[in-house]
Design a protein with these regions (language model features):
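Structural signature of extracellular appendage/secretion-system components
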Residues: 1-449
């Protein structure tokens, strides 16, 4: 006769197993609003059967809970992290581009470029009627000052945006380092629990949430590989190697992580750049992180695009001649004098190596297009260095395919140089006279600093 206690044991196992499953469901419901929480499930299996002296040979002994694990898909995690970088890139760009756009608003509530320019030319047109009226002349001068004040104000505002982005780059790097530290600590806590046979659901959720955040900042790759017994490769210890790569470079290696640091540039790259723009390097090797490269993405890439974006219009050319103290460059990318964006002193990059220059001159053809630039170097070159540089490609800054602050400032500078130059040429023409009928030769109405 079957034991009644055996039947009670089977029933008890069922009650216990489904009580655990019910508690797991309650836990899922309770954490419905918990950020980063993954749904958990109780994994059930039949208990070991008992051998019996009967025709059927064995009898089931009930049910047992093998584990309670989070339900996550590695495939969807990977896809999500890959697309997070693109989301972070465009969200960050959108925020700053809207700020830039605000400086060019021209409507009933905010007077912008077109309105101010039209007002100045209307005043100029008024001068053609009572040309000797000093009040009319003064009104034109006032409107011209307003026109210049507008551009100075926009330039100041764009510079402030560049400063703001630069500081956000620094705070973002600090956040990346903090995330790396947290992930490395969580890796250790998770392995301590799981090497003893448990499963660290909540800690894994915390780690995945950190990866979610990190992947929106920089392109992120994650790898988790079981640690096996060195003497028995098929035997897993329960621990895992967990590595994280950002921008294709190892960032977290299980319990260790590498820090990034910001280093201020010693020279400006663009003529209108603010001082102290940051570059990102690895703290241990001082190698460049290249957050703004074309292959990168994420909110950090967006910050570099806004701060340094030049629409791929940086200075480039071929080295035609080299002396101990100068480098002459022909076939330049910038042939219009008014379109020059290079700082008076800065850095030439040739074959990945930097050469500081203290000054430059240029020559033009009959059409006033620049043919060659000659840069005066800060440090003299040896004869071997001169021979190696001849015929190489040179550039100032990087070619960044984005319309950021440097691009808009360069467009403004080029417009103002052309406008002021044309206006001053008229003022210096042979027919130009002042109020007293005197020639206005060598008189510049618009000047720049």
């Amino acid at each position: 006769m079957p034991s009644q206690f055996f039947g009670l044991t089977i029933a008890s196992s069922g009650l216990s197993a489904y009580q655990a499953a019910l508690n797991t469901t309650a836990n899922n419901i309770s954490n419905e609003q918990t950020k980063g929480y993954s749904r958990q499930a109780a994994n059930l299996s039949a208990s070991d059967a008992l051998r019996v002296n009967a025709k059927y040979g064995s009898m089931g002994s009930g049910v047992m809970v093998n584990s309670i694990k989070q339900i996550r898909s590695e495939y969807y995690d990977t896809k999500y992290w890959q697309n997070q970088a693109s989301l972070g890139l465009y969200e960050t760009k959108l925020g700053y581009l809207e700020q830039i756009e605000n400086y060019f608003i021209d409507d009933d509530t905010e007077k912008g470029f077109s309105t101010i320019l039209n007002k100045m030319f209307n005043s100029l047109d008024t001068l053609t009627h009572p040309a000797g009226d000093t009040n009319v002349r003064q009104q034109f001068i006032s409107d011209a000052q307003s026109f210049m004040t507008y551009f100075n104000s926009v330039a100041t505002g764009l510079g402030q945006i560049q400063d703001s982005v630069n500081e956000e780059i620094k705070s973002t790097v600090e956040n990346i380092n903090a995330i790396g530290k947290k992930i490395s600590l969580l890796n250790k806590q998770i392995n301590v629990i799981e090497v003893q046979g448990g499963y660290a659901n909540e800690l894994r959720d915390q780690r995945a949430l950190l990866i979610d955040e990190l992947s929106s900042i920089v392109p992120t790759e994650v790898s988790e590989v079981p640690v096996t017994n060195s003497k028995h490769p098929d035997m897993q210890t329960g621990a895992n190697y967990y590595t994280v790569k950002i921008n294709g470079q190892k960032f977290v290696d299980t319990y260790e992580y590498s820090e990034l640091t910001c280093v201020a540039r010693k020279n400006t790259i663009n003529q209108s750049d603010r001082e102290g723009m940051y570059e990102i390097v690895w703290a241990d090797t001082v190698n460049s992180f290249k957050a703004g490269s074309d292959s990168s993405s994420g909110s950090l890439k967006a910050l570099f695009d806004i701060r340094d974006g030049n629409n791929s219009e940086n200075f480039r050319g071929s080295i035609k001649g080299v002396t101990a103290s100068t480098i002459t460059i022909s076939n330049p990318s910038i042939t219009n004098v008014n379109a020059m964006t290079m700082p008076a002193e800065g850095v030439l990059t040739i074959d990945g190596k930097n050469y500081n220059y203290t000054d430059f001159t240029f020559t033009t053809d009959a059409d006033r297009n620049v043919k060659e630039y000659t840069f005066t170097l800060e440090n003299q070159l040896s004869s071997d260095q001169q021979a190696k540089l001849d015929g190489k490609q040179a550039s100032i800054g990087e070619s960044i395919d984005a319309m950021g602050v440097p691009y808009y400032l360069a467009q403004m500078n080029e417009f103002l140089r052309n406008f002021a130059g044309s206006f001053n040429d008229i003022m210096n023409s042979a027919d130009a006279k002042d109020l007293n009928g005197n020639s206005t030769d060598y008189f510049s109405f618009f000047t720049g600093t």
